[in-house]
């Protein structure tokens, strides 16, 4: 195994230590700083607006399979949205293009309403598989928006060309729309058609950012520290090779050249 060496073992030990350190620090109330993400801050405002208007909201967890990291991040956001909606006595409609996501989303939403003491507000028929085809999915979602008169739309997860097809009808209805995806090619379409957009790795940080749960928060900050270490090593390596040549002690220690 090419990378099974002492340097890799040391890196794993260092990164694991950083993450564990920040997790334990977060549990003691010193989780670290996370910069403000406007799109996530406006989720509560969107839920409150829909509640005041007495109209439901739509949450769409993307078109990726349930094991996709973007879908998993979206389901974390769904849990937060469902909890807030339950506390405010509002209704969340989940639409999806992936059948396997239906029972997972149903369990998340049901648990949120139950924990909020409002199990009567949960309706299994609000978790809807619409269509696997992109065009049919967009048409069916637009139909739900029109029939239900939704006031807030959340689009989080992995998206393909359907991103604009899904959000453009919502823009026409005047609903507040918040989107987030890790697919950079779809970001311009969300920016054009949504009120707020969560971009790239901000999606992965969403659950920790919204809930401030110590384990997730500490893990997120610890990973950022690890990235800083990697960046520092890369810069030091590049400088040392440029100034001292490929045979200098630092490069030899890192095992870049053999």
Regions found by a protein language model. Give the residues of each.
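Soluble extracytoplasmic domains of inner/organellar membrane proteins
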Residues: 129-171, 176
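Long, charge-dense
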Residues: 84-86, 90-138
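Short, acidic/small-residue loops that bind anionic groups at enzyme active sites
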Residues: 84-85, 173-191
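Hydrophobic alpha-helical transmembrane segments of small proteolipidic membrane proteins, enriched
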Residues: 1-38, 240-245
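Membrane-cytosol interface motif
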Residues: 35-52, 56
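C-terminal functional extensions of proteins
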Residues: 191-258
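Gly-rich Lys/Arg/Thr-decorated short loops/hinges at beta-loop-alpha junctions or inter-strand turns
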Residues: 22-30, 119-123, 186-188
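Histidine-anchored nucleotide/phosphate-binding helix
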Residues: 71-89
């Amino acid at each position: 195994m090419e990378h099974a060496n002492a340097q890799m073992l040391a890196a794993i030990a260092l990164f694991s230590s950083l993450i564990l350190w920040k997790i334990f620090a977060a549990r003691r109330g010193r989780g670290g700083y996370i910069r403000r993400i406007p799109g996530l801050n406006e989720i509560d405002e969107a839920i409150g607006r829909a509640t005041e208007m007495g109209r439901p909201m739509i949450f769409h967890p993307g078109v990726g399979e349930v094991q996709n990291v973007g879908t998993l991040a979206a389901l974390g956001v769904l849990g937060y949205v469902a909890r807030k909606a339950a506390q405010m006595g509002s209704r969340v409609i989940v639409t999806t293009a992936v059948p396997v996501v239906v029972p997972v989303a149903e369990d998340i939403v049901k648990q949120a309403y139950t924990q909020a003491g409002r199990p009567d507000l949960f309706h299994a028929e609000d978790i809807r598989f619409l269509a696997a085809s992109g065009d049919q999915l967009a048409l069916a979602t637009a139909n739900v928006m029109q029939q239900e008169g939704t006031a807030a739309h959340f689009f989080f997860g992995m998206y393909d060309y359907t991103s604009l097809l899904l959000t453009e009808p919502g823009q026409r209805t005047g609903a507040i729309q918040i989107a987030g995806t890790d697919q950079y090619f779809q970001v311009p379409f969300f920016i054009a058609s949504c009120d707020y957009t969560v971009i790239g790795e901000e999606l992965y940080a969403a659950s920790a950012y919204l809930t401030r749960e110590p384990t997730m928060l500490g893990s997120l900050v610890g990973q950022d520290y690890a990235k800083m270490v990697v960046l520092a090593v890369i810069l030091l390596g590049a400088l040392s090779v440029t100034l001292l040549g490929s045979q200098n002690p630092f490069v030899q220690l890192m095992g870049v050249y053999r």
